[in-house]
Amino acid sequence: MDIHEILKYLPHRYPLLLVDRVLAFEPGKSLTALKNVTINEPFFTGHFPHHPVMPGVLVIEALAQAAALLTLKTSNVEADENSIYYFVGIDNARFKRPVEPGDQLILKATVLKERIGIWKYAARAEVDGRVAAEAELMCTVRPKET
């Protein structure tokens, strides 16, 4: 899945679109995506000026976007103005190594279960085959409140 298809499913745009490409997709089961981390990311200006590190919360956000793509593409639900994909919970988040400019962040999301419209995933971010972060994420699609 290239960036053009990703934009059909995710409502995120610069500077918060954190998935560049989908490398593998197994409907209802798993998705592997890629984020190229460059020194031009706006967050590196302040985090940290002399030793740039991608904020952990943005690594988790990138994982949540990969999980969203897994659910939305599985369900064939494109981004629209009537519904929104919410990140509703996180368990067991761990950060194992920093993510720095020049890294390729591999984002892996695997469905653990789906119940009453809430999806639970095992999510892992890797750089060069080493775990950078991992967590269990919970998300849901809901109508937008007007």
Swiss-Prot record:
Stated role: Involved in unsaturated fatty acids biosynthesis. Catalyzes the dehydration of short chain beta-hydroxyacyl-ACPs and long chain saturated and unsaturated beta-hydroxyacyl-ACPs.
Q: Which GO terms describe its molecular function?
A: (3R)-hydroxyacyl-[acyl-carrier-protein] dehydratase activity
Catalytic residues identified in the record: 47
Keyword Cytoplasm carried by entry = yes
Q: Report which gene this protein is encoded by.
A: fabZ
Q: EC?
A: 4.2.1.59
Chief location:
cytoplasm
Q: Which CDD domains match?
A: FabZ
Q: Which cysteines are joined by disulfide bonds?
A: none
An example GO CC term for this entry is: cytoplasm
Q: Name one Pfam family in it.
A: FabA
Q: According to the lineage, what is the superkingdom?
A: Bacteria
- This chain's protein is named 3-hydroxyacyl-[acyl-carrier-protein] dehydratase FabZ
